[in-house]
């Protein structure tokens, strides 16, 4: 291929936006196609690129003890537009990186529109391109026509599961005579970070009544032929409750690390947490409360939570279908479709789960495609890095027969020899993983600084 060859990227979510940015910064001309706002989806509200539709959290930012924090570090080192923009629109969230979602998406959109090597067009793509380097990053809400085309080419049905979306509450409707502000274990370097969450306490009787209401509430029904397979990291709360009455109390409603200033001598039996959803602090999402309850049921059930008895909702929860391909069967180690190697896949459609994981796969696909167009060969990506471990998992490390969406985690990394196992050795083990990864990532990335006369991120 030649440097004049254009790269087509279908889908302007986290992965597609990152792929476009990376390839364009390496000197490749990119055409980015996004179907919104011409074709809308259930979950999206705008036509912005990189719109966040579920949580507003990029999760832990700890690059020494957490695999997703390490992924943040690797992406920042590679001039990620998603990470740089997230850093510019961060919200207090203790040790996590939470983002003001609308200004974030608007900023990513503006940066990509302003890039001289990126052309953005809007409209639906309904078939696989017959030729030309292409990245498909259409995400969990891939249009039905394109999904059918992918399924025909793959020779198998696309796998499917369902994502649920958490509700968002107006802050001024929360009863702060009952609720209080505190991050778990007072995490954070500033008072604002240490008070990043609003907490609503429940007694045992209130918790039991809440569980009863969850289990009996009206739920959204699936269409004929659809079955409910859920990713464990985004389970609806009522599905968690069905797994056991105490499941929520040891999950999103765990009461640990919190002290109620209204009644410091009494330990709550369970706690519902809300996390700031915008910079103004006027909106809060209910952490871990993805749901498929009907809208009417949500209003009734959530009003049972002390502090939310008069809550007003900016958005109620919902459920949407999430499709992904069997990547270990269909993709090679360069993320190319084996049967049509001019096509790469990236993002959530490949079977990674999470905003950052999706964007990171876009980062890799964009760099791999750009190198190919420029006639260069990238060195093999070490599986000791977070991105290397993740792409190795989806392109062959996982069992194709049981393949399910995966967050990045240290279980995907090759072991570091000579380290103590078990809980007691965990801190040293994780630090060894991240030190090794950072060195390997730097070594892999450094030779690419001159690739195509690459440009720095804004």
From Swiss-Prot:
BP GO annotations: tRNA methylation; tRNA wobble uridine modification
Keywords (A to Z) from UniProt: Cytoplasm, FAD, Flavoprotein, Methyltransferase, NAD, NADP, Transferase, tRNA processing
Cofactor(s) this protein requires: FAD
Pfam families (UniProt xref): GIDA
InterPro entries to which the protein is assigned, alphabetical: FAD/NAD-bd_sf, MnmG-rel, MnmG-rel_CS, MnmG_N, TrmFO
Subcellular location: Cytoplasm
EC identifiers of the protein: 2.1.1.74
EC class of the enzyme, as a word: transferase
Positions of FAD binding: 11-16
GO molecular function terms noted in the UniProt entry: flavin adenine dinucleotide binding; tRNA (uracil(54)-C5)-methyltransferase activity, 5,10-methylenetetrahydrofolate-dependent
Residues making up the signal peptide according to the UniProt record: none
Record field: catalytic activity: uridine(54) in tRNA + (6R)-5,10-methylene-5,6,7,8-tetrahydrofolate + NADH + H(+) = 5-methyluridine(54) in tRNA + (6S)-5,6,7,8-tetrahydrofolate + NAD(+); uridine(54) in tRNA + (6R)-5,10-methylene-5,6,7,8-tetrahydrofolate + NADPH + H(+) = 5-methyluridine(54) in tRNA + (6S)-5,6,7,8-tetrahydrofolate + NADP(+)
Entry GO terms, CC: cytosol
Family of this protein: Belongs to the MnmG family. TrmFO subfamily.
Role: Catalyzes the folate-dependent formation of 5-methyl-uridine at position 54 (M-5-U54) in all tRNAs.
NCBIfam families: gid_trmFO, PRK05335.1
Protein name as it appears in the record: Methylenetetrahydrofolate--tRNA-(uracil-5-)-methyltransferase TrmFO
The species this protein was found in: Jannaschia sp. (strain CCS1)
Organism lineage string: Bacteria, Pseudomonadati, Pseudomonadota, Alphaproteobacteria, Rhodobacterales
Encoding gene per record: trmFO
